[in-house]
């Protein structure tokens, strides 16, 4: 059975009309992912970046070591933006980010059992529990990631008071203040555009095969002759690379440049090759669906 919630979710992902979404879900027996493909094949939806609904509160924070060779990024969730703005909560998150840069833990469960650097006794888990008791709101350390580099630097960018956090790792044999400028510019690009891949080598064959099939069906539906469809498909794959690979994207600060071209220009300035080696992007509440409150229903319950 196709529910209104399923139709709503598909509309949010694709931007397609309600009836088109319902038909696509019916055609695919309620499989949202396949329904997205059906809508794209019919030209009714743009290529979807399914990052999931963003609903949870909290903060994304980064920590960069003084030598800029090691860094971390963390997400700590809470229930309301009121607590997210609380100075004690911010302090907790900042300490957790700093501790994450040096941890040997491989997952969150192990990490939160470590002795907390913000107090003389107790673990990270204990510190979180204590603040939960004090502020009366549930909190959790959701995820963390580390980056390190030998020759080069790592820089960060935080957008929207902790809504989005980015780490960017640059490799370069020469030290220069220009590297920080480049890394911050690239980090802002990642925050703004949310590229799925660093470069073409990160795009797996399964993804490319799926895209090719969608483009092929689109071309045939447009009435294009079979003999030119393959050429059209490959042209659209090249466009896919340019839209989804960070180094091939048009730079948001100057559309005359791609990120790759901008980095090469700066390499000349430094006198050594600069390479964008890695990036990490966390968005607060990414993929977490928050319970939607029905105000009218809540009033009814209170009146009963």
UniProtKB/Swiss-Prot annotation:
CDD domains: UBA_EF-Ts. Keywords: Cytoplasm, Elongation factor, Protein biosynthesis. The keyword Secreted does not apply. It comes from the Bacteria. Residues 80-83 are annotated as: Involved in Mg(2+) ion dislocation from EF-Tu. Gene3D superfamilies: 1.10.286.20, DNA helicase RuvA subunit, C-terminal domain, Elongation factor Ts, dimerisation domain. The keyword DNA damage does not apply. Signal peptide: none annotated. One of its GO terms (cellular component) is cytoplasm. Pfam families: EF_TS. PROSITE patterns: EF_TS_1, EF_TS_2. It is found in: Cytoplasm. Coiled coil: none annotated. InterPro entries: EF-Ts_dimer_sf (IPR036402), Transl_elong_EFTs/EF1B (IPR001816), Transl_elong_EFTs/EF1B_dimer (IPR014039), Transl_elong_Ts_CS (IPR018101), UBA-like_sf (IPR009060). Its main location: cytoplasm. GO terms for molecular function: translation elongation factor activity. Belongs to the EF-Ts family. Associates with the EF-Tu.GDP complex and induces the exchange of GDP to GTP. It remains bound to the aminoacyl-tRNA.EF-Tu.GTP complex up to the GTP hydrolysis stage on the ribosome. This is Elongation factor Ts. It comes from Clostridium tetani (strain Massachusetts / E88). The lineage of its organism: Bacteria, Bacillati, Bacillota, Clostridia, Eubacteriales.
